[in-house]
């Protein structure tokens, strides 16, 4: 999987290249990260990449020309182009699974007051948001997207079964988890987890997943019940 990030602040991604699991995946060539500076493509002699908004309005807007030329240069494979935007569909686990099947993804990061709508409407395939709030740029959102999608790629986590027990993978939240010591400040690990009975342990975990989802995310729990009933199970 290759991620091509178009940004005005390429140095923002230096940390990601050496960060934990994702950094190791890059070093082991499981994923590839290409960070491209949009400013390198501007034809403005002052290296300007933004301008005033037609019709008036606060702030400046990123112009079409440098973004378009950048896309034309780097997206030789006609890969999916994702624009990080608060107007996009909110990122979830199912979208991460879907994107992990792509061979290459181009991620456009906006800044200032955003990007000229002609770029979004005609040269981007999809807008994705990481939540219903506004940030100063798309870089942090792009890092979240890269991290979430990369975890779905074979060998990135070391154990390909790991992500399948994550919260949201099968709609339900993850079960409660415990490690040593067996008793901490009077709080004990559930006895069944120490029993060695794998069938009972799995039953406990399933119940814990259901309870956590119902308690913490009623909206997801109702969605789970709806899909379960539709499936006839």
From Swiss-Prot:
Belongs to the RNA methyltransferase TrmD family. One of its GO terms (molecular function) is tRNA (guanine(37)-N1)-methyltransferase activity. It is found in: Cytoplasm. GO terms for biological process: tRNA N1-guanine methylation. Gene3D superfamilies: 3.40.1280.10, tRNA(m1g37)methyltransferase, domain 2. This is tRNA (guanine-N(1)-)-methyltransferase. It catalyses: guanosine(37) in tRNA + S-adenosyl-L-methionine = N(1)-methylguanosine(37) in tRNA + S-adenosyl-L-homocysteine + H(+). The keyword Ribonucleoprotein does not apply. It is an enzyme of class 2 (transferase). The lineage of its organism: Bacteria, Bacillati, Bacillota, Tissierellia, Tissierellales. SUPFAM superfamilies: alpha/beta knot. The gene is trmD. Keywords: Cytoplasm, Methyltransferase, S-adenosyl-L-methionine, Transferase, tRNA processing. Pfam families: tRNA_m1G_MT.
């Amino acid at each position: 999987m290759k991620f091509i990030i178009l940004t005005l602040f390429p140095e923002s991604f230096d940390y990601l290249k050496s960060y934990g699991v994702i950094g190791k995946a890059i070093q082991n060539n499981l994923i590839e990260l290409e960070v491209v500076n949009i400013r390198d493509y501007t034809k403005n002699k002052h290296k300007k990449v933004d301008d005033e908004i037609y019709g008036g309005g606060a702030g400046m807007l990123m112009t079409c020309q440098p973004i378009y030329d950048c896309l034309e240069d780097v997206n030789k494979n006609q890969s999916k182009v994702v624009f990080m935007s608060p107007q996009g569909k909110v990122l979830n686990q199912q979208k991460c699974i879907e994107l992990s099947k792509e061979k290459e993804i181009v991620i456009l990061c906006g800044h200032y007051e955003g990007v000229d709508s002609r770029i979004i409407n005609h040269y981007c395939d999809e807008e994705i948001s990481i939540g219903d709030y506004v940030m100063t740029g798309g870089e942090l959102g792009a890092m979240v997207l890269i991290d979430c999608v990369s975890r779905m790629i074979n060998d990135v986590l070391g154990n390909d079964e790991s992500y399948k027990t994550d919260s949201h993978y099968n709609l339900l939240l993850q079960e409660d988890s415990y490690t040593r010591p067996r008793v901490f400040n009077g709080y004990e690990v559930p006895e069944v987890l120490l029993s060695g009975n794998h069938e009972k342990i799995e039953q406990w975990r399933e119940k814990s997943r259901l309870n956590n989802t119902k308690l913490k995310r009623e909206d997801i729990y109702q969605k789970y019940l709806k899909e379960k009933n539709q499936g006839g199970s």
